Amino acid sequence: MSGSYWTSMQRQKWQHTKPSLARERQRLWVMECQLFPQGLNIIVDSKPNSADSSNGNAANNGGGNGRSQLVATTKNIPITHRDLHYDKDYNLRIYCYFLIMKLGRRLNIRQYALATAHIYLSRFLLKASVREVNLYLLVTTCVYLACKVEECPQYIRTLVSEARSLWPEFIPPDPTKVTEFEFYLIEELQCYLIVHHPYKSMEQIVEALKEEPFKLTFTSDELQNCWSLINDSFINDVHLTYAPHIIAMACLFITVSIQGSNTKELSLTSAVTETLTSQSSLTPQQQTFFRFLAESHVDLEEVMDTIQQQIILYDHWDRYHEPWIKYLLHTLYLRPLSA
């Protein structure tokens, strides 16, 4: 346990470089290909071919309903496809984020605890595949353990009851299933449960900016935007690779860029690009923040990479398709054993 990120096990044991993270992901990829070479078979409704369609229409007209029938066919999703691979499937990443947030809001759990649950889930899914564990039970257990670590514990029966009300098909009524999974989770986390988050770093940076010579203050709306950006960043890998202050600085950079642009006409990508390229048209707030950024001696490459990952995330978010990922998980966990 450590009160400082710099001496914490989070930095010493769980902060990856990009190559080390890629090696962990490759190891999991190989394991998944060995354990689940058959991929996943799903049922897809499709329109019949022209010959079948004409026969079907004749039959339908005779029956008086006038409707063409859909044909159920089986489709195989190969194990090498990105679907259901946490590192490649942003649909799955965003869905996991919503699962944790949904359960947390039902129980009024503090954001710090939910952020810790996100980190636990990300670390666990470096070691295990969603194909071999119940994702909904994993989410419930991560929230349960995170609440204990962040000193806002939840009664396990209450937690399980709320989880069952959200996902009745996937959460067993027996609370001991969560406690059993908790031991499995702690083992995979190697008992390193203390997590340092960017929220505190953001508050420290904001306080530092209020002092001389910067005298820069943020409105409550700007701080809320930055807080929301940090929340969303847990979908990415940045919390596995960079220090909390790097993520906080990147989110403040995005906040300053957006506030200085016409957000009704510019996307996030355009706003950040405009800020980086149009030095002559920077607002006083942007100029002051960039001077602070330059004088703070943080790793600018890491800050820029975090910003880039956030932009990529929102690009994927625009194409997020929740019914598809829910259907895949439903098929994966609830299909007949003979399938």
From Swiss-Prot:
Q: Name one GO cellular component term.
A: CKM complex
Q: Which residues form the Cyclin N-terminal domain?
A: 93-194
Which GO terms fall under molecular function for this chain's record? cyclin-dependent protein serine/threonine kinase regulator activity; RNA polymerase II core promoter sequence-specific DNA binding
User: By its UniProt entry, which Pfam families does this protein fall under?
Assistant: Cyclin_N
> What domain of life does the UniProt record list for this protein's source?
Eukaryota
Write out the biased-composition intervals (Low complexity).
49-60
Q: Which UniProt keywords apply?
A: Activator, Cyclin, Nucleus, Repressor, Transcription, Transcription regulation
Q: Name one GO biological process term.
A: positive regulation of transcription by galactose
Q: Does the keyword Nucleus apply?
A: yes
Instruction: State whether keyword Zinc-finger applies.
Output: no
| Annotated segments matching region Disordered | 48-67
The record's subunit annotation is: Component of the SRB8-11 complex, a regulatory module of the Mediator complex.
What function is annotated for this protein? Component of the SRB8-11 complex. The SRB8-11 complex is a regulatory module of the Mediator complex which is itself involved in regulation of basal and activated RNA polymerase II-dependent transcription. The SRB8-11 complex may be involved in the transcriptional repression of a subset of genes regulated by Mediator. It may inhibit the association of the Mediator complex with RNA polymerase II to form the holoenzyme complex. The SRB8-11 complex phosphorylates the C-terminal domain (CTD) of the largest subunit of RNA polymerase II.
Q: What is this protein called?
A: RNA polymerase II holoenzyme cyclin-like subunit
